[in-house]
Amino acid sequence: MVMKTRSANNKGKRLQNNIRDLILEKFQQLEEDDVRSTTMGDSGEDVLLSPAARRLFPFAVECKNQEKLNIWSSLEQTETNAGKHIPLLVFKRNRSKTYAVLEFGKLLELLDEDSESTQ
């Protein structure tokens, strides 16, 4: 059965809203309008961050809630929309966990920065 466009958009919007809520839950010093889910069909990042939010969460988020994800085209879209920020692809499918993907080298850089700040 093929999913209608409206249903697919609602499914994607639910993931965007969930990611927005998780970021706000993790960084409780942020205000609700520091992290916003974009309108479906808008170009650019799926979760918009204020400068205050960006300092805590330096990622450009692209959300995909699809049963069959083309990982390579999704990563390309994520990188295109990221601009100067760190591209982060967040994805899930029905009844699955939510996963996040970023370039491995960038992950190592972030871990290195984190270890330097804790020394």
Language-model features, listed with the residues they occupy:
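Catalytic phosphate/metal-binding cores of nucleic-acid and nucleotide-processing enzymes, i.e., regions
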Residues: 1-119
